[in-house]
Design a protein with these regions (language model features):
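Alpha-helix boundary/capping detector
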Residues: 152, 228, 267, 286-287
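Short gly/pro-enriched beta-turn/loop segments at secondary-structure junctions
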Residues: 205, 262-263, 298-302
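Glycine-rich beta-alpha junction loops
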Residues: 39-40, 216-218, 271-276, 287, ...
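A short linear-motif detector with a strong N-terminal bias
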Residues: 12-14, 246-247, 262, 283-287
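Conserved glycine-bearing catalytic or ligand-binding loops at nucleotide- and phosphate-handling centers
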Residues: 248-255, 259-279
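A conserved regulatory-domain signal marking ACT and ACT-like small-molecule sensing domains
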Residues: 279-317
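Nucleotide/pyrophosphate-binding catalytic subdomain
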Residues: 1-257
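A broad, low-specificity signal marking well-ordered, structured residues that form hydrophobic/aromatic
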Residues: 172, 187, 267, 281, ...
Length: 317
């Protein structure tokens, strides 16, 4: 049995979250494949630095300290050299951006460093808890994306032909959000795309299920920004989930469900600190019920425009 777990930045706020993650992995039957986002707030810091690289002098030092607070001993471990390599890569990208701000290759490498650091932190911590884990870079093992620079989705067909399955033995911690673009350079998915990375990997390895661990207990029927208190939807069909993700559901990336619907892999969305008997959302095959409204979505800042024109004959009158 293979379970793909995805832990986002909201589940990587401090070292206590790593303790909880290790408990989750130990309680999972069969093999666990882990996909991670950057630690909470890291991507935003890297993005700001990409806009003002000349003034990001303390960034590398601050990121080093932050990640070592999460996982002490990482720098001295057997993957410490990888940690140093990522930090040096950040410095290099900042220098390249300072010289040429429109260098999108350097910008993407800079932004992807958050996921690389996170994978190292989580993997090292799991090893200290007796879990045989290792970090994996998505583009290094053949995960291909449909685009260059920025890509909408993982290219499942190309990835299936190139994926190095041997690197996914044990308990791998895989970087989310990016992969190899069609031009051979690193490419990024949209923000929140680590969920899509997780479901794409599940499709490629024929996993039994995917669990997206969040700081919310599933998909809510109404966006919480509306200020209406609700409880999570217990079950959504693949089609329903895809429709909600395109409208107003911040929990789901629009491309998340598609790789699972194609092969029937179930998806669970769970709160990291709530047990399974609490609220959660399971996404699976569509169950048609024409009288059951499960959620309400709304696209903000959209206007309806109607244009009427006269025919050439009418205009000539």
């Amino acid at each position: 049995m293979i379970t793909v777990h995805k832990f986002g930045g909201s589940c990587l706020r401090d070292s206590s979250d790593l303790e909880r993650i290790s408990q989750v992995i130990k309680q999972t039957n069969g093999q666990s494949i882990i996909v991670v986002s950057a630690l909470w707030g890291t991507t935003d810091r890297l993005l700001r630095a990409s806009h003002e690289p000349r003034y990001a002098g303390r960034l590398v030092h601050d990121l080093e300290e932050q990640h070592l607070r999460f996982s002490p001993g990482l720098a001295e471990s057997n993957i410490g050299y990888l940690f140093s390599n990522v930090l040096r890569g950040i410095e290099t990208s900042l220098v390249e951006l300072a010289m040429k701000p429109e260098n999108n290759v350097a910008k993407n490498r800079l932004l992807a460093a958050g996921e690389r650091l996170s994978a190292l932190v989580v993997s090292h911590f799991l090893n200290t808890k007796g879990i045989n884990s290792h970090p994996v870079g998505a583009e290094d093992i053949g995960l291909r994306l449909n685009g260059k620079g920025k890509a909408p989705t993982v290219d499942l067909e190309s990835s299936r032909n190139n994926l190095d399955l041997s690197s996914l033995q044990g308990t791998p911690v895989l970087t989310g959000w990016f992969g190899q673009g069609t031009d051979g350079e690193l490419a990024l998915l949209g923000r929140g795309g680590s969920d899509h990375t997780a479901t794409a990997i599940a499709n490629l390895v024929d996993a039994n299920k995917v669990i997206l661990w969040k700081d919310v207990a599933g998909v809510l029927p109404i966006n919480p920004r509306w200020g209406i208190e609700t409880t999570a939807i217990n079950y959504l069909g693949y089609g329903e989930a895809m429709e909600l993700s395109r409208l107003d559901t911040p929990v789901l990336h629009p491309a998340t469900v598609e790789p699972l619907a194609a092969v029937g892999i179930p998806l669970e969305i769970m709160h990291l600190y709530q047990e399974r008997d609490f609220s959660q959302t399971i996404i699976g095959p569509d169950i048609h019920d024409e009288y059951n409204i499960k959620g309400i979505g709304c696209l903000a800042s959209v206007a309806y425009l109607s244009i009427e024109t006269l025919s050439l004959e009418e205009q000539s009158k």
